[in-house]
Amino acid sequence: MAKLLQSPPRFLPEEWYIANKSQYHRAEAQRSQSERLVAESQRLVEEIEKTTRKSQSDVNKKLEQRLEEVRFWKKELDDKLEQLVNQTDDLLTYKTRLERSLESYKEPLHITEKCLEYREKRVGIDLVHDVVEQELQKEADIIHGVMNLLIRTLEESTEQIRLNRSAKYNLEKDLRDKFTAITIDDVCFSLNNNSPNINFSEKVVRIEPNSVSLEDWLDFSNANVEKADKQLNNSTALKTLVDQILSQTANDLRRQCEVVDEAFINGLKETKDARNKLADHLAKVMEEIASQEKNIMALENAITQQEGPAKVAHTRLETRTHRPNVELCRDIAQYRLIKEIQEINHNVARLKETLAQAQTQLKALYRRQLALQEEIQVKENTIYIDQVLCMEMRKSIPPRDGDDHGAWEGGIRAEAIC
């Protein structure tokens, strides 16, 4: 209690001056240190502000460059996509041309096969493997070959359209990604320190594990463009091939149609000439039959005419057998009567022999008449088949003047096949 009541210590004046001076020096030192820190802080703030502005400006430039680069590739992809869409549309048109062309060959093939079927109904010697049949068979083979080629080309076109659509899908997906990237980078590029909705985000200062390098990005974009270019080139080549196939096959079949038509014309001319010659021979045979029939009638009449003289001679001989006694003489008259009967018998025999020959010849003429009539009917049947059935049916194959590509080349007008 006594200690608590003690008075505080007393200092000397010198101690007071020294203590104050010490406070002055410490305050001066602290102030000086603080001033240096303030100056250093201002310099640091200015430096950091400058660095930040420069860094932000550099980021803005990099974002702008990136936007330009992505926009460049987006334009490349847009161009390729447009070209690919146009090429695919063209291929769809070419596919339609192929389908129409393929369909247009069915009727000519049916006509050709029907002509071959009709010509199997020729009869006799006219059932010949002639030039017409050879050319018809060649025409059928050509049409079958053309249709098989068109089917294969149609399959190639379908596959190319599928590849184009696959490339189109990849381009569209890449374009969507690039559009999203451009939208995002546009937003990032437009941000500034005064923009609303800017804030701190946790765990963003890192490289995403599923991100790709710039080289990989370039390779990916370039690969999509190259794939599109490949399909564009393939599509162009396929269109050229389709044009060539449609044109060449149409020309080949057009020429074969003309060859078949010419073969029909020549074959009909030969058949009609043969029929006309047969008709001429038939007319001559008919004339000869009439002549031979008259000849037979004349021979039969001549034989009949010999009956009177023969009866007279026989009656005379029989009557003279009744002469009495020595009057039954073998006189000259007797011998002449006998000779007359012999002559008559001989002449009748000759007439009958000639009559038999004439009758045989008449039968042969009748057979020849029948054979000629049958052969003419064979020719008429052939002419009917070739001219009425085949050539008339082939008229439904449109004109083959070559002025119109027509359906054989996948044209729009179905009536202009050849």
Swiss-Prot record:
Its main location: cytoplasm. One of its GO terms (cellular component) is axonemal microtubule. One of its GO terms (biological process) is flagellated sperm motility. Keywords: Cell projection, Cilium, Coiled coil, Cytoplasm, Cytoskeleton, Flagellum, Microtubule, Ubl conjugation. Pfam families: Tektin (PF03148). It comes from the Eukaryota. Residues 20-107, 134-177, 266-308, 332-383 form a coiled coil. Ubiquitinated, leading to its degradation. Deubiquitinated by USP16, promoting its stability. Signal peptide: none annotated. InterPro entries: Tektin-like, Tektins. It is found in: Cytoplasm, Cytoskeleton, Cilium axoneme; Cytoplasm, Cytoskeleton, Flagellum axoneme. Microtubule inner protein (MIP) part of the dynein-decorated doublet microtubules (DMTs) in cilia and flagellar axoneme. Forms filamentous polymers in the walls of ciliary and flagellar microtubules. Microtubule inner protein component of sperm flagellar doublet microtubules. Belongs to the tektin family. This is Tektin-1. It comes from Mus musculus. The gene is Tekt1.
